[in-house]
Amino acid sequence: LPASALPEVKAAIAADPHGIDAILTAASVAAPHAALLDHRADIDRLFASDTLEEVFAALEADGGDFAAQQLAILKTKSPQSMKVSLRLLYDGSLMQSFADEMVQEYAVATHVVQRHDFLEGVRAVIVDKDNSPRWNPATPEAVTDHLIDQIFAPLPPAEAWTPN
């Protein structure tokens, strides 16, 4: 659904709430080609590891423009946040239910917002707008498994997410 069609579609749904399926079908269009798909083989190869250090090593060793561009982008991001993201992806692939994932996501988010890198990211992008965050730890190697385990610690039952 193109963004330009939203006002018209909203008005049509408001006028005929029972016709949502037909309205959305009539307004839908094929998605444009995603340029990222042109790099699918590179992405699958370069990002195959479950560790950030190995992803960085693969990008550094590749020598291609795409790998160099991605490495440059990743080096501006919080090493802690990237390691948290990799762990969430890995753990999520093993979970049996959406509720289990939500429990973990909520606990992780609760811990992350209390840490330096979250506050530093807010400072660099929203407050000072200098886009020069000073991450701590500053490198993937400095983000220890112990630190990540602390971020993934379950919340006490009274604070944990529940589906109700």
Protein language model regions, located:
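Short alpha-helix boundary/capping motifs
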Residues: P17-D21, V113, A153-P154
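Terminal peptide-recognition signature
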Residues: L1, S85, V125
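C-terminal amphipathic alpha-helical interaction region
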Residues: V108, H116, E120-N164
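Amphipathic alpha-helical blocks and their helix-capping loop/short-beta junctions
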Residues: P2-K77, S81
